[in-house]
């Protein structure tokens, strides 16, 4: 600790007069024999180093110094004391509104450091606290000043911040007194008015809608004026977009007072009497409703604001399910999207001042949910940083009925942030002025260093987890204290009355005015809900599905694109093996005119960019590709320089971003979803390293990507690539869990595809890009190949890219056209289709009884295309569905009822594949091979 204090705090310039002379004498002794000095002195000189020449010259005037070695020991001890106050002062701070100050044991007594008041008085104040106000004249006063500064109703933790510039900046802001400049009378009255609004709304809801859940903010009321200040300061500094993420605690109050959601709309939701006249179709506030909708404390909103300097900004509160903290990376992705300009080739141009993220966490969820650590890890990464997010832990010191000693292994709810070197402020929610000081520090730190900052807002929860819950059953002592504790509005009003800033009459008038507004709003709400017996109807464009769009690209354009994709600067040294691969690609339009999977993808990306659509691709190892197939980023084998051909396409007015992601599925997928929602014109692609690992992000598929539009009217065109296929690599490298996506498929909520050709992949990507800004847009989930990436049977003719389109069902080529002889239709999807094709081509004897087709688009179910095949097969007897996955996985449970519904009368529908299993695949490659051979053989063998 002493070493840190010297390294971070002391320089030779801080010694003056006799002190300096004596320190120089000791330094000379240190140079001759370091071991002759006390250990603390030796450590101090280790850190100080040699004195500058001008310092030694100045000391010549102070030869009368008669200090002893003991005196310099006192200086070192005093400096250590000061550093300990900075580091541990928070332990003695008054940040808990329910704990009396006198209950705390006083820390840092002088005697523990071998000091007396007289000892410390002799030391210059600047040695102890160089930024102290001028009225602090000696070391004793400096120590007392530090004690008072670091043990207020606001306390600080930044010893874990290792960058000197940041630590020094924080120390100066705190110790100079700048943070604690008294607020103006107007500001204090404004805060009182805001606290009155916050409290009055909660009390009105409590009395009017008895027993209904609202997840009250009471006990953390100061959160609203804090958000006001963060937004005001940021907008004044040039921010034009503020994204807020929070859970349900206090959400209704934030919606009403920060987002401007009218009281009458909130009341109508409690009354279960939605009145369309109350919902603005246009205006400053947009409320999001989907088809099935969501509960009132999950809904988001957005609002345009204008400050007194006529600067405008958009404030958005993200829609949020009850899955705590999972909104965090979504908000950061939305923020990154708003910061970037994507209208030129190359990487997008980011301006972190344009947009900011505010994340409001729970004290139990912040240390408890792993997605928080995943999100914090994004904060300094090139592909994901947002110039710093401001985090606020809405800390009511309890999680439902679980107290903090049962829910975390750390002292503070905020301790996780220390691992990411995020400065932390703890502040008492009953002291609004201290709360605003915390906000000031947070906003200025973010603006200065473009890094995250965390405020631990410590309050309490006035009622139970929800208003139907009785907390005294599990926390009787705590809630006895809460019931006796005055509200922050009353505490603050009394403080202002005592200071003569307002009188009781003014306080009463403020409350009466707020109450009048609440009552007027309530009178606008219908008395009861109208009967709703009709079924929810999807918007027509959604129910009709995708229209036909032209996704072809003419041959000459493709040829030019390919030339650009396989070109690099003259002096750029491409890795030899990769160079040969690129040279083969260069000949794709000269020799056999065949395009493999990776080239089809690159040409799809290039053509999408040339059409003016920005593109963002991320995932683990996505620059190269898990299977070394993509190689969009070339690395000079001698210099390490990078070259991205997609950044150098001619006549392109759209950006291309590609980033290797951290080893996280949840935070990265959430980030990309947020980016896509806020940048709907951008084609955003997330790729799993293997599809098996996507379930680490299952919450995002379940709560957001599949259902966001139904719940909140939130459209998304996100593309998800999941490498999938059974190749003997065991249960963790075989399955993207197609069944889970198909189980969630309804209301045309997404497209699920399992593709088998380069051309199909090319066209489905281009179709998605063309649909991005249309009402019909939906996410696209693709089970992508692994070994098939280099399988000649997935290669496509160039003309399939220039003269064709995506086919939801793909009939195998080379089959007999004697349709009247066909008695079995073999349907499959994905890699097993290629296995079937290979086996069929090697079969000898009569094969006309078979017809084979691949279902490339599983959802929406391609009924029309499959019926068209049936119509050609008059003597069809059976339809077999063949899959690699076990019977309880894959597409079978989803597709069976569809097939039975569309199958001709008396035609059987049968399953061929692995039996029902708990694990997706065999661990033994030999067993896998035998099972795979059986499945393929059975599908092509006539039953006796």
Curated annotation (Swiss-Prot):
GO terms for cellular component: cytosol; oxoglutarate dehydrogenase complex. This is 2-oxoglutarate dehydrogenase E1 component. It catalyses: N(6)-[(R)-lipoyl]-L-lysyl-[protein] + 2-oxoglutarate + H(+) = N(6)-[(R)-S(8)-succinyldihydrolipoyl]-L-lysyl-[protein] + CO2. Keywords: Glycolysis, Oxidoreductase, Thiamine pyrophosphate. It comes from Bacillus licheniformis (strain ATCC 14580 / DSM 13 / JCM 2505 / CCUG 7422 / NBRC 12200 / NCIMB 9375 / NCTC 10341 / NRRL NRS-1264 / Gibson 46). Belongs to the alpha-ketoglutarate dehydrogenase family. Residues 925-936 have a biased composition (Basic and acidic residues). Its EC number is 1.2.4.2. Homodimer. Part of the 2-oxoglutarate dehydrogenase (OGDH) complex composed of E1 (2-oxoglutarate dehydrogenase), E2 (dihydrolipoamide succinyltransferase) and E3 (dihydrolipoamide dehydrogenase); the complex contains multiple copies of the three enzymatic components (E1, E2 and E3). Pfam families: E1_dh (PF00676), OxoGdeHyase_C (PF16870), Transket_pyr (PF02779). Residues 914-944 are annotated as: Disordered.
